[in-house]
């Protein structure tokens, strides 16, 4: 496979906002053709416009919890661009701030469906495309979280799914070796996004106190993902932890 990003095709899930939008724009600026996946068509179009528009950007509204829609996403990517070289497997939701004893089954399932099942379905779609195409191979980057290592209070569904993503990453990395498919994970702490905005106003700490936390410019995340993606397939960033330097992560769990 060519190492030139101008010949590569990326699929980005959760591309309508936050980390997904920032990474989709950065990949497009680096020369990738980018397929933008997310639930809201209007948000995907906003991302496409912010990335410069044009024929090398494809908005593909997708609910990652629905197998048929994920199949359609990768079919659209292949029909438009002929291959898939990169999946940034980013779509995710949280249900933080709910006491463990107050969690409902529906809330638990909604987080698991997006953060774990959706990530599996998208990784499988990319894996199948990468295995079958010529030249063979590609790269999958799963968006984990520092919650894959240490929980926050009242975050059981999110924390459990992010721990599970680490296992998924390891399994894909192992199973992909024979097909030149690399899989890595980026664990991000406190990037400035709409989802994480509450961090600046104060969130519950392990000791029960409420405190604001240091934040990280989402552009740093986008740069890290582009770096991981740009490596030749003989090299892989298996796990990267990228966090705000002064956030309370080390020592919290």
Protein language model features and the residues they cover:
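The beta1-alpha1 cofactor-binding region of Rossmann-like NAD(H)/NADP(H)-dependent oxidoreductases
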Residues: 61-73, 105
């Amino acid at each position: 496979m060519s190492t030139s990003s101008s010949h590569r095709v990326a699929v980005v899930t959760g591309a309508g906002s936050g980390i997904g939008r920032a990474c989709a724009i950065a990949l497009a600026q680096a020369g990738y053709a980018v397929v933008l996946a997310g639930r809201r068509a209007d948000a995907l179009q906003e991302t496409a416009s912010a990335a410069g528009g044009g024929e090398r950007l494809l908005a593909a509204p997708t609910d990652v919890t629905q197998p048929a829609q994920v199949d359609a996403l990768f079919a659209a990517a292949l029909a438009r661009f002929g291959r898939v070289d990169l999946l940034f497997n980013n779509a995710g939701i949280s249900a933080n701030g709910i006491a463990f004893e107050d969690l409902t089954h529906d809330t638990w399932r909604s987080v698991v469906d997006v953060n774990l099942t959706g990530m599996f379905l998208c990784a499988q779609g990319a894996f199948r495309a990468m295995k079958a195409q010529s030249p063979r191979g590609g790269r999958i980057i799963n968006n984990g979280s520092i919650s894959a290592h240490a929980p926050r209070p009242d975050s059981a569904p999110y924390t459990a799914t992010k721990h599970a993503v680490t296992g998924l990453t390891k399994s894909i990395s192992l199973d992909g070796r024979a097909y030149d498919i690399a899989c890595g994970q980026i664990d991000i702490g406190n990037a400035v996004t709409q989802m994480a905005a509450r961090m600046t106003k104060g969130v519950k700490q392990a000791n029960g106190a409420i405190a604001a936390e240091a934040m990280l410019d989402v552009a740093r995340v986008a740069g890290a993902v582009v770096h991981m993606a740009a490596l030749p397939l003989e090299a892989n960033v298996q796990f990267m932890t990228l966090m705000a330097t002064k956030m309370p992560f080390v020592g919290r769990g």
